[in-house]
Amino acid sequence: MEIQPLPPLPEPSAKTVTQLRRYASLLAVANERVRLTGPYDEETLWTDHIEDCLHVLPLLPPSGTVVDVGTGGGLPGAVLAVCRPDLKFTLLDSLSRKTKALAEIIAALKLPNAEVICMRSEDFAAARR
């Protein structure tokens, strides 16, 4: 099986970049209280995580709901929710300290298409059957 190169990154709008930068800032601040991801500074979050999340965009469905299992600080789910307001995102994590911090970030970003749920993935799947 031949490994295919990643699709080219879509060019986000200025509004999307502004919102993603705000997300990076909020995540960096939350990281000081609750360890949500490894790097703490905004620039490292941007280059090591947010830009990587953007590579998923071409692979998303045209409609429906996307579930981010083990979302932690919202990577990639929150990033994708900013970029694709036409899709619904469920950000799932089993650790309440992480989901509480992430819910605050999502509320600050005013992302109506993102829902944060504190639940184990097995329980979430069983509840949706």
Short names for language-model regions:
Residues 1-67, 100, 104-114:
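Class I SAM-dependent transferase core
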Residues 54-129:
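Conserved SAM/SAH cofactor-binding pocket of Class I
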